[in-house]
Amino acid sequence: MVRISGFCCAMSLAERQAALLVLADGSVFHGYACGAAGTVIGEVVFNTGMTGYQEVLTDPSYCGQIVSFTYPELGNTGVNPEDEESARPQVSGLIARNVARRHSNWRADRSLPDYLQQHNIVGIYGIDTRALTQHLRSTGAMNGGISTTILDPEELWAEVKAAPSMEGLNLVDQVTTDRPYEWQTPTSQTWEFIEGPTTESLTVVAIDFGVKRNILRRLASYGCRVIVVPADTPIEEILRHEPDGVFLSNGPGDPATVKNGISTAQALLQTGLPLFGICLGHQILGLALGAQTFKLKFGHRGLNHPCGLSQQVEITSQNHGFAIAADSLGPDVEVTHLNLNDRTVAGLRHRHLPVFSVQYHPEASPGPHDSDYLFEQFVALMRDRQPTPVA
C-alpha cells in the first residue's frame, strides 16, 4: 500500500479526529474528519472548479461518488439556502485539502462542516489533494472509502474492493422524483443574466433522471410551464400532459443501464416533439438514436472546459464520467460540439427531427453562462411547432 499524509490548519490539533481514505488500488491517505462520523464507499472523482462547492455537493449527478476538490480552500463562503441544486447533498463523501470552520458571506446561514454534519455526510480533509488528483488522472477514477471509525487500512480496503463499479450501475432510481410536480420558480432577478422572454405559453415535460434545480429555473425563466415527471414515466402519461417539448435531464450512473429512459426516448423520437437533453439526458438520447457510450478514464468535472466545433468556442461547466462514442453515431445524427480538451462528443442534433443535446451544463450553477442560448434554442423549436393563431 502507498501511504500519503498531509496537513491542515482548519482546526487545532486537539480538535482533530483522524480519518482515512483508501482507494481500490490500495493507495492510502491519512487526514482528519470533517462532517459526520462513519464509513462511506463510492467512486472517487475530482472536480477542478474554484467555486461552487455547494452546488456540486447537491448535484444529483454526483450520487454514488466521493468528490475531491482540487481547489485547496473549501467552505470560506459557508452554505446558503439559495444555492442548493436539490433538496439535500447527493455526494457519498467529500475530500478537501482544507475546510474552513469559520465562513464569511452575507448569504451564508451556516458553516460547511455544520452542513455536512447536519446531512450525515462523511468527509476527510488535510490530505494532499494534488497528489490524489494526479494519481486519479494517471490511473483513472476508482472506488474508494472514507472512514472515521475504520482506521485499519487493510480492513477499509477490503470493504472498498467489495463495492460495485460505477460501470454498469443504475443510480437514477435513487435521485428521481417519486411523483409528478409542476416547477414554477424562475431564476431570481438578483442573478438573472439574460433578457429572455417571460411568457411563451409552452409546456415542457422534464423527465427527471436527477435534475438540477437551475435547469428548471432556466426553463421557467423562458416562460415555460414545466412539469417534472419520474424517470420511469410511460410515454402515454408524458403525452397526457400535452407537451410542446420534452426535456431529458442530467443524472448519475451508467447511461446504458437506464433502459426505461432509453425506450421512452425512442418512443418520443417517433412523435416529432422537440427534445432537449443535458448530460445523462444527452447520453440517453444518443443511445436511443443507436449510438454507444463508454466510460471515460477520469471524467470531466469542472467549470472551464472548452467546447465547440469550428469558429465558436464556449467555456462550459461539466460533470460526467461517460461519453458517446463518435464512431457509433448514425448518418442522421450530426455532432455539433466537441470537448476541445480530448475531442469527445459534447453536443449533437438530429438532421431531420427537432432533437438536440449537449454533454455539458448550459444552466451552469456553478460555472459560466456561455451556453444559456441553448434554452432559447429549445424554446424556438417548440414555438416553431405551435400552430399559428388565427387572426
Swiss-Prot record:
<feature type="active site">
    <location>
        <position position="361"/>
    </location>
</feature>
<dbReference type="GO" id="GO:0006541">
    <property type="term" value="P:glutamine metabolic process"/>
</dbReference>
<comment type="pathway">
    <text>Pyrimidine metabolism; UMP biosynthesis via de novo pathway; (S)-dihydroorotate from bicarbonate: step 1/3.</text>
</comment>
<feature type="active site" description="Nucleophile">
    <location>
        <position position="279"/>
    </location>
</feature>
<feature type="binding site">
    <location>
        <position position="321"/>
    </location>
    <ligand>
        <name>L-glutamine</name>
    </ligand>
</feature>
<dbReference type="GO" id="GO:0005524">
    <property type="term" value="F:ATP binding"/>
</dbReference>
<dbReference type="Pfam" id="PF00988">
    <property type="entry name" value="CPSase_sm_chain"/>
</dbReference>
<keyword id="KW-0547">Nucleotide-binding</keyword>
<feature type="binding site">
    <location>
        <position position="61"/>
    </location>
    <ligand>
        <name>L-glutamine</name>
    </ligand>
</feature>
<comment type="pathway">
    <text>Amino-acid biosynthesis; L-arginine biosynthesis; carbamoyl phosphate from bicarbonate: step 1/1.</text>
</comment>
<feature type="binding site">
    <location>
        <position position="283"/>
    </location>
    <ligand>
        <name>L-glutamine</name>
    </ligand>
</feature>
<feature type="binding site">
    <location>
        <position position="251"/>
    </location>
    <ligand>
        <name>L-glutamine</name>
    </ligand>
</feature>
<dbReference type="InterPro" id="IPR036480">
    <property type="entry name" value="CarbP_synth_ssu_N_sf"/>
</dbReference>
<keyword id="KW-0315">Glutamine amidotransferase</keyword>
<keyword id="KW-0067">ATP-binding</keyword>
<feature type="binding site">
    <location>
        <position position="253"/>
    </location>
    <ligand>
        <name>L-glutamine</name>
    </ligand>
</feature>
<dbReference type="InterPro" id="IPR002474">
    <property type="entry name" value="CarbamoylP_synth_ssu_N"/>
</dbReference>
<dbReference type="GO" id="GO:0004088">
    <property type="term" value="F:carbamoyl-phosphate synthase (glutamine-hydrolyzing) activity"/>
</dbReference>
<keyword id="KW-0665">Pyrimidine biosynthesis</keyword>
<comment type="function">
    <text>Small subunit of the glutamine-dependent carbamoyl phosphate synthetase (CPSase). CPSase catalyzes the formation of carbamoyl phosphate from the ammonia moiety of glutamine, carbonate, and phosphate donated by ATP, constituting the first step of 2 biosynthetic pathways, one leading to arginine and/or urea and the other to pyrimidine nucleotides. The small subunit (glutamine amidotransferase) binds and cleaves glutamine to supply the large subunit with the substrate ammonia.</text>
</comment>
<dbReference type="GO" id="GO:0006207">
    <property type="term" value="P:'de novo' pyrimidine nucleobase biosynthetic process"/>
</dbReference>
<protein>
    <recommendedName>
        <fullName>Carbamoyl phosphate synthase small chain</fullName>
        <ecNumber>6.3.5.5</ecNumber>
    </recommendedName>
</protein>
<feature type="region of interest" description="CPSase">
    <location>
        <begin position="1"/>
        <end position="199"/>
    </location>
</feature>
<feature type="binding site">
    <location>
        <position position="319"/>
    </location>
    <ligand>
        <name>L-glutamine</name>
    </ligand>
</feature>
<keyword id="KW-0055">Arginine biosynthesis</keyword>
<keyword id="KW-0028">Amino-acid biosynthesis</keyword>
<keyword id="KW-0436">Ligase</keyword>
<feature type="active site">
    <location>
        <position position="363"/>
    </location>
</feature>
<comment type="similarity">
    <text>Belongs to the CarA family.</text>
</comment>
<feature type="binding site">
    <location>
        <position position="280"/>
    </location>
    <ligand>
        <name>L-glutamine</name>
    </ligand>
</feature>
<dbReference type="GO" id="GO:0006526">
    <property type="term" value="P:L-arginine biosynthetic process"/>
</dbReference>
<dbReference type="GO" id="GO:0044205">
    <property type="term" value="P:'de novo' UMP biosynthetic process"/>
</dbReference>
<dbReference type="InterPro" id="IPR035686">
    <property type="entry name" value="CPSase_GATase1"/>
</dbReference>
<dbReference type="GO" id="GO:0004359">
    <property type="term" value="F:glutaminase activity"/>
</dbReference>
<dbReference type="Pfam" id="PF00117">
    <property type="entry name" value="GATase"/>
</dbReference>
<dbReference type="InterPro" id="IPR050472">
    <property type="entry name" value="Anth_synth/Amidotransfase"/>
</dbReference>
<feature type="binding site">
    <location>
        <position position="322"/>
    </location>
    <ligand>
        <name>L-glutamine</name>
    </ligand>
</feature>
<comment type="subunit">
    <text>Composed of two chains; the small (or glutamine) chain promotes the hydrolysis of glutamine to ammonia, which is used by the large (or ammonia) chain to synthesize carbamoyl phosphate. Tetramer of heterodimers (alpha,beta)4.</text>
</comment>
<dbReference type="InterPro" id="IPR006274">
    <property type="entry name" value="CarbamoylP_synth_ssu"/>
</dbReference>
<dbReference type="InterPro" id="IPR029062">
    <property type="entry name" value="Class_I_gatase-like"/>
</dbReference>
<feature type="domain" description="Glutamine amidotransferase type-1">
    <location>
        <begin position="203"/>
        <end position="388"/>
    </location>
</feature>
<dbReference type="InterPro" id="IPR017926">
    <property type="entry name" value="GATASE"/>
</dbReference>
